[in-house]
Amino acid sequence: MEERHYNYTPERKEEIQRTLMVDKALPDIDEPVEKVSYMDGCKIYFKNGGWIIARFSGTEPLLRIFCEMPEAYQAVRMCEIFEEFLELKN
């Protein structure tokens, strides 16, 4: 599993939340998507059994991105795609 954490300002949180939860915008992804859930953040399920979720921490000002894919390099790349899409810097 690949896991990343990003700090944000209140203004930046609003932008990210609008992008993912209101506009429901997603990055261009090469993997076929099975479904998207917005129950606990934005979670994309892939047809290969993998998934990625971007969600805000409930206890600290962090955006967390977690990804599981069949191969570790795929999870790393998927996190990089989300990082670029949301313009996140660690």
Give each language-model segment a name.
Residues 1-90:
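Phosphate-binding and adjacent anionic-ligand microenvironments
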